[in-house]
Each structure stands twice: as structure tokens, then as C-alpha cells.
């Protein structure tokens, strides 16, 4: 086999491969003989079909299969010979495929870049410390009660936290705009469900009151037509209702899966869930800083093929989130590559950097941490042991956990080198900052 390598630009390589005709013809001959033993043709007994007949009927197809197999095998043999690591599938350009002549083709592909790690000791990371207090638990229970609240109509002015039923019509320059009209719409004042100023403008109104609100849409509003636009909403209040919170009793606790132990057990489980959420948020906060520092401190030439693959992954994830059926619309038109380009490039960049850290630090997934992570995932289900068994028997899920654990180990490795400052914080501050990321 003859191989010549050319660096065309950046990460792109051009490999010219030549395979002796004898090798190809021998393999074609062997495939024809194998087909002759197995093929059934009318007028001949199975296994007794003349080779000339098989060649006439199936020769072209068999040759095509052999050429494909030879190209595939010879390509990977060639990249091993040249110590190359292809990133993505090659583009194959045939040069010579004629029978009886050496097979020759050109493979164009990208290779993985070399990543030179920066000095991890200069990273400055802020590690927040927080605990779940009794006050935090009280506040969370209040939130849970509000989620289970019932509403009773009242004959008084609306206040923050009340639910109003309204009709409204929005206009821009005196003309109604799309999506700006609704009848019998329930709205909790203070929920920030509407644009700034809308809910505050209804505080103090009673059933039957009418009011025109002069407001401005935010500059970052999703509709291009309404970004930063001055509008008016003509609002009619149909009714005002106040929340009636449920009592902390057995019926309430059962709604959250607490059958025994009363309020003490309920508080215990609420606190455990909050601690789990807080722990994950604290971990994510540190991890986010570490990953940002890695991206900022490294310049990596990312293979276009890997970015394209990651774009497709992100597009599929978005489709799954919104329940989109690909056959019903032009996916690439609705969700173009440009929508995911930046995030995909970042993910590929991080993957390459993290991979190099794993290699240089000789990190391997820690079995105890894998077990612990699976148990933590399982603890949120009604039958934890079934979930644990399912993860341990599913190689794809297990690989996902191993990857997550290895990434956590990379973060720990970086923290052991970096300048880390501990800062006291609160449950609310940590959880709010997580929601804003």
C-alpha cells in the first residue's frame, strides 16, 4: 500500500492511498467464489453455479462492495501508519477504480488538534459556602403551600399576591398587535408573568374597574416588532381573588409522598431535597467558573466536523424538549446551525481541553464516586434499588455517569492547583444565581 500525506490548511489533511490491483482482484475473486457456493439461480443446483455466471450476474455489485471495504480498511491502516487521529469521517475522492489497475483514492479529513495546557495555578475561583437553615425550610414550605392554594373571590382592592381575572387589549400606535389580547385571563400579581409594570399597574383595582396602562416592552423581548416598543394595554378587572393556603396536615403531607411521621418527617424530607438541590447548585457554580476559566485561558483550533456533530446533538435535544416531529417541518430552516454554533464550539473546545487534562493527569473514573452518583440519582425515585440495577445493567447510562464523574474529577484536579477563595452565602442567593445562568 502506498500512502502520501499533505497538510492542506490548519487541521485538514489530504491522504492519497494506493492499493495494489492484485489485492483487490484476489478479494473480488474470493467473494465471487463465496457467492457461487450460496447463490440460488434457476437452472442450477445450489453450490453448482458456474463462476462465470455468478460473475456476469453479480460481478459489478460484488466489486463495488469489495472496493468500499478495501477503501475503508486501507484508510484506517494509512492513518495508523501516519500516526493521525481523524476527527470525523473522511471525504473520499476516487482517482482510479478500474478493474485490473491499482485502486487509488484521496481522503480529505480533519485531525484532532494538539492542546497545550495553560498554567492551572493562576486560575482564581470563588467557592461559595451555604447551608439550609430552618428559616429556608419555612420559606420553602410557604412556597409549597402557595402552589397548593385555592382562590376565593373578595370584594376589595387587589394586592400583591392576589389573583385577578382580567380582559385586556394591547395596542401599539393605536393598532392591536398579535398576542396582545385575552379574555378571562387569570393573573397572580407579583408573579412577573407579564412585562414590567403590567402587574404593578393593577394593584389597587377592584372588580369592574378599568385602566389603561402605558408600558414599554423590554429591549430583549423575543418579538422583533415589540422590542423596546411603547404600547398601551386597556384592562378590565373581572374579579379579585385571594389565596387560601392549605393547612399543614396529613392530607397536605400526602400530596408530597409523606405518609407517616407528620410535620416532623415532612420538614425532614423538604430539607433533604433542599440540601440536595443546594449541593448541586454549589457544585455547578464552581464548575461553571472552572469551565469558563479553561475556555478563556486556552486557544484551541476546533475541528469543523466535531462542531457540526455537536450542532446536530444540540438541535436534537431542542427538538426533544419541545416535542418536535422532524417530518412535519424543515428542521434546519427552523433551527439553523447558526443558532447552535457558539455553544457547539464551546462544548467541543471544552471537551478537547478536558480530555487533555485527563490524559496529562492520568485520571480514571473513580468507582466509589460512580456508585455514589448513581445512588443519588436513584434516591429521587420511589424504587431506588430498581433504578440502581437499571443503571448498572445499561452500558449507555453507565458511560454517561462515568463521564460526569470524570468531569467532576477534572474540576477537583483544577481546584487543587488553582487559587480558591471561600465565600459565605445563603441558600436563596445560590439558588437564584443558578436560575440566572
UniProtKB/Swiss-Prot annotation:
GO terms classed as biological process: 'de novo' cotranslational protein folding; cell division; chaperone-mediated protein folding; protein transport; protein unfolding
PPIase FKBP-type domain boundaries: 161-246
Keywords, sorted A to Z: Cell cycle, Cell division, Chaperone, Cytoplasm, Isomerase, Rotamase
Gene Ontology CC: cytoplasm
Matching HAMAP family: Trigger_factor_Tig (MF_00303)
Notes concerning its domains: Consists of 3 domains; the N-terminus binds the ribosome, the middle domain has PPIase activity, while the C-terminus has intrinsic chaperone activity on its own.
Protein name as annotated: Trigger factor
Native species: Cellvibrio japonicus (strain Ueda107) (Pseudomonas fluorescens subsp. cellulosa)
Amino acid at each position: 500500500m502506498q500512502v502520501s500525506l499533505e497538510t492542506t490548511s490548519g487541521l485538514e489533511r489530504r491522504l492519497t492511498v494506493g492499493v495494489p490491483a492484485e489485492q483487490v482482484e484476489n478479494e473480488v475473486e474470493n467473494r465471487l467464489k463465496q457467492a457461487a457456493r450460496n447463490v440460488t439461480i434457476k437452472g442450477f443446483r445450489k453450490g453448482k453455479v458456474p463462476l462465470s455466471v455468478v460473475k456476469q450476474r453479480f460481478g459489478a455489485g460484488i466489486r463495488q462492495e469489495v472496493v468500499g471495504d478495501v477503501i475503508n480498511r486501507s484508510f484506517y491502516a494509512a492513518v495508523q501508519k501516519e500516526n493521525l487521529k481523524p476527527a470525523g469521517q473522511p471525504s473520499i475522492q476516487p482517482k482510479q477504480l478500474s478493474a485490473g489497475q491499482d485502486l487509488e483514492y484521496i481522503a480529505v479529513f480533519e485531525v484532532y488538534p494538539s492542546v497545550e495546557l495553560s498554567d492551572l495555578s493562576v486560575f482564581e475561583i470563588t467557592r461559595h459556602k451555604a447551608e439550609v437553615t430552618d428559616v429556608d425550610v419555612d420559606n420553602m414550605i410557604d412556597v409549597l403551600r402557595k402552589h397548593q392554594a385555592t382562590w376565593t373571590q373578595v370584594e376589595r382592592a387587589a394586592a400583591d399576591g392576589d389573583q385577578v381575572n382580567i380582559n385586556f387589549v394591547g395596542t401599539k400606535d393605536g393598532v392591536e398587535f398579535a398576542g396582545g389580547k385575552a379574555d378571562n385571563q387569570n393573573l397572580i400579581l407579583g408573579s412577573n408573568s407579564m412585562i414590567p409594570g403590567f402587574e404593578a399597574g393593577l394593584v389597587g383595582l377592584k372588580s369592574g374597574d378599568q385602566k389603561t396602562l402605558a408600558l414599554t416592552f423590554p429591549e430583549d423581548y423575543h418579538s422583533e416588532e415589540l422590542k423596546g416598543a411603547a404600547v398601551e394595554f386597556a384592562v378590565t378587572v373581572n374579579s379579585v381573588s385571594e389565596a387560601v393556603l392549605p393547612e399543614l396536615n396529613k392530607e397536605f403531607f400526602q400530596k408530597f409522598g409523606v405518609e407517616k411521621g407528620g410535620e416532623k418527617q415532612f420538614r425532614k424530607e423538604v430539607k433533604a431535597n433542599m440540601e440536595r438541590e443546594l449541593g448541586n447548585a454549589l457544585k455547578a457554580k464552581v464548575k461553571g467558573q472552572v469551565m469558563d476559566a479553561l475556555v478563556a485561558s486556552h486557544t484551541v483550533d476546533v475541528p469543523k466536523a466535531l462542531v457540526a456533530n455537536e450542532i446536530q446533538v444540540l438541535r436534537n435535544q431542542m427538538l426533544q424538549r419541545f416535542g418536535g416531529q422532524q417530518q412535519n417541518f424543515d428542521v434546519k430552516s427552523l433551527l439553523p446551525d447558526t443558532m447552535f454554533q457558539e455553544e457547539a464550539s464551546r462544548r467541543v473546545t471544552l471537551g478537547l481541553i478536558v480530555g487533555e487534562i485527563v490524559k496529562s493527569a492520568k485520571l480514571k473514573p473513580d468507582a466509589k464516586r460512580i456508585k455514589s452518583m448513581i445512588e443519588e440519582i436513584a434516591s429521587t425515585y420511589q424504587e431506588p434499588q430498581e433504578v440502581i440495577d437499571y443503571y448498572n445493567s445499561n452500558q449507555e447510562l453507565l458511560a454517561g455517569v462515568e463521564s460526569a464523574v470524570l468531569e467532576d474529577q477534572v474540576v477537583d484536579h483544577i481546584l487543587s492547583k488553582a487559587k480558591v477563595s471561600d465565600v459565605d452565602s445563603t441558600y436563596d442567593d445560590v439558588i437564584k444565581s443558578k436560575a440566572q445562568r
